[in-house]
Amino acid sequence: MARYRGPKLRIVRRLGELPGLTQKNCTRDFPPGQHGPKKKGGGNQKTKESQYAVRLKEKQKLRFNYGISERQLMSYVREARKRKGSTGEILLQILEMRLDTIIFRLGFAPTIAAARQLINHGHIVVNGRRVDIPSSLCKVNDSISVALNSQNFVKNLLQSFTKTLDAPYLEVNQEKLSAVVRDNIPREAVSLQINELLVVEFYSRKV
């Protein structure tokens, strides 16, 4: 399944706030549809979701927030299961340590998709070398920065959006547009509202 390239607010209406997907706020609090919110028996009561639907929704939150394909997510679930600890928390840690997510969390881009473009176009340096693979996984003590010849471009980009940095595991130098990964991300620092256990349960018979 390829990455979604359609209307972002449509996804937000269906899944809820996705900070990595868009900064725009959704003014409608019901899922997208031709006739507005669904009603049961003509009243305001919502139709109860099945357990499968609830798990699917949590899985889709991860996919759309981090901008990854179904195949990539399944691969990350497999990797998380191999490591010691809570599979769900390790899965989130892997996704948050992707280079595109780190660039977004540093406030160098308004969305993860925008961060991916910066990386693809060669604007990002990791440990002294240009890296153009957004899915590269960062490690503790990695040094990440904007390339010297890209500094003005990124500084101009920063003026086009509002970003509040909330990543205590990253040591940031805003003036030099650089940072060091000081620790693995703690669970409470993940900005996405997600029940990762339901995602693991969704894939329990698939991987």
Swiss-Prot record:
Looking at the record's lineage, which domain of life comes first? Eukaryota
Alphabetically ordered keywords of this record: Chloroplast, Plastid, Ribonucleoprotein, Ribosomal protein, RNA-binding, rRNA-binding
User: InterPro entries recorded for this chain?
Assistant: Ribosomal_uS4 (IPR022801), Ribosomal_uS4_bac-type (IPR005709), Ribosomal_uS4_CS (IPR018079), Ribosomal_uS4_N (IPR001912), S4_RNA-bd (IPR002942), S4_RNA-bd_sf (IPR036986)
Q: A single Pfam family, by name? A: S4
Alphabetized SMART domains for the sequence = Ribosomal_S4, S4
Tell me the subunit arrangement: Part of the 30S ribosomal subunit. Contacts protein S5. The interaction surface between S4 and S5 is involved in control of translational fidelity.
Per the record, the similarity remark reads: Belongs to the universal ribosomal protein uS4 family.
The protein's role, per its UniProt record: One of the primary rRNA binding proteins, it binds directly to 16S rRNA where it nucleates assembly of the body of the 30S subunit.
Q: What is this protein called?
A: Small ribosomal subunit protein uS4c
Q: What taxonomic classification does the UniProt entry list for its organism?
A: Eukaryota, Viridiplantae, Chlorophyta, core chlorophytes, Trebouxiophyceae
Gene that encodes it: rps4
